[in-house]
Amino acid sequence: MGHYKANVRDLEFNLFEVFGRQEILGKGIYADLDVEAAKDILGEVARLAENELAASLVDSDRNPPIYDPVTCSVTIPESFKKSYQAYLDGEWGRLDTPVELGGMAVPPSLRWSIAEMVCGANPAIHMYGATFSFAKLLWHMGTEDQKKLAKHIVDNAWHTTTVSYTHLTLPTSDLV
């Protein structure tokens, strides 16, 4: 076990005993998500955060991305690639993706509970996972061309990022 231990009981207490999320789950826009499914999501993200995501924290912290100006490429630790791929394989970013783009209607309070675990385990994974949040922003506020880009971002888990150099941009998919 790594450095991170998710406090699922605290998250469930806040979601269901303080904020009463059981009153909205299984109904209306959240009809496809009941309390049991929400708790299952919390449990699975906790397992992922404590294991696969936390596993690369120290290595990726001690070995930051390195830009090679000759090849215009960025190198990141293999352990980080493996952690991020585990996040992508679980399709956890789709919980913050519009339904129209293949996402799932999830209350913001549940999304923030998930974000707490991912960020606690490995903040860089949380930032890379923001790819899907950026797509959501483009989908809701963008032009028609930007909405096409949002779909591309979600379909390919891709976006352009700047890594320490204001003139450098490349697809995140090239890093993984």
Indicate residue ranges for each PLM-predicted region:
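Acidic, Ala/Val/Gly-enriched low-complexity intrinsically disordered segments
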Residues: 174-176
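A short, Trp-centered hydrophobic/proline-enriched beta-strand micro-motif
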Residues: 156-164
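Amphipathic, small/basic residue-rich leader segments at the start of a protein or domain
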Residues: 1-125
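An acidic- and aromatic-residue-enriched active-site/binding cleft used to recognize and process polar
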Residues: 97-100, 130, 165
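Conserved catalytic alpha/beta cores of large enzymes that bind or transform nucleotide phosphates
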Residues: 152
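A glycine-rich phosphate-binding loop feature that marks nucleotide/adenosyl-phosphate handling sites
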Residues: 131-135, 155, 168
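N-terminal glycine-rich flavin-associated loop
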Residues: 126-144
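Conserved small/polar residues in nucleotide/adenosyl-binding loops
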Residues: 166-172
